[in-house]
A protein has these predicted regions:
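Residue-level signature of catalytic and energy-coupling elements of molecular machines
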Residues: 7, 26, 55, 88, ...
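A cytosolic-side transmembrane-helix exit/cap motif
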Residues: 58-73, 90-98, 188
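Interfacial segments of transmembrane alpha-helices in multi-pass membrane proteins
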Residues: 9-68, 137-140
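Small-residue-enriched core segments of transmembrane alpha-helices in multipass membrane transport
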Residues: 39-61, 73-80, 147-179
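Hydrophobic alpha-helical transmembrane segments of membrane transport and translocation systems
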Residues: 96-202
Length: 202
């Protein structure tokens, strides 16, 4: 499941191209369906992806870096999906409130409030799964392995493997989703709504 040097060299450009195409399609679809909030959500999504890659690559010295495996890439993709989902929920709630006749400011307030609970529920569930995976398949002296020792002791020592990379990238991406998909998106939307010339494209 580890990407070999030859495979990595040959497929890197293809992976980057596929990622850019997928992102362009997401931007087009989100903008078409949700207009300005959808476009702003895609900016936050790009920040989430960049921050996730920075954490994985060891750009921040306090966090460990590791070789990116196929399960690790899968974790990043799933976290991106969670980010898109969070932004869709928020944008859809705002759209519903506007269709019900509320003012823009009222729709934003109600939409943010209605969208927060399902976003938190979904992300907390994924965080729990990621922590369990990191505890079960990470180093035996790792933080989560020690914290969950009372759960895993009956199954023998934890087994280090590539699933740990999946859990790590998934946990990192979902936590960053709270920062970018919830907080940053809402700050940008509120900021755009305060600009008179941008109050129409909603």
């Amino acid at each position: 499941s580890t990407v070999s040097p030859s495979l990595g060299e040959n497929s890197l450009s293809a992976m980057v191209l596929a990622g850019l195409i997928a992102y362009a399609l997401i931007v087009a679809l989100m903008t078409l369906l949700y207009r300005l909030p959808g476009f702003l959500a895609c900016i936050a999504l790009a920040g989430q992806v960049a921050a996730t890659l920075a954490f994985v690559s060891g750009y921040f010295p306090v966090f460990e870096s590791f070789t990116l495996t196929l399960p690790g890439i899968a974790g990043i993709i799933l976290a991106i999906g969670m980010g898109v989902d969070a932004n869709v929920i928020t944008a859809e709630r705002i759209k519903e409130e506007l269709n019900n006749g509320k003012s823009l400011d009222g729709a934003l307030k109600s939409g943010f409030a209605r969208g927060l609970t399902p976003i938190i529920d979904g992300n907390v569930t994924i965080v729990i799964v990621a922590i369990v995976l990191m505890g079960a398949f990470g180093p035996s002296d790792g933080l989560f392995a020690k914290a969950l020792h009372f759960v895993f002791f009956a199954f023998g020592p934890s087994t280090a493997g590539t699933i740990y990379a999946f859990g790590y990238t998934l946990l990192t991406g979902v936590l960053l989703n709270f920062v970018f998909g919830v907080f940053a998106t809402r700050v940008m939307i509120r900021g755009a709504a305060s600009i008179k010339s941008l109050r129409n494209p909603w």
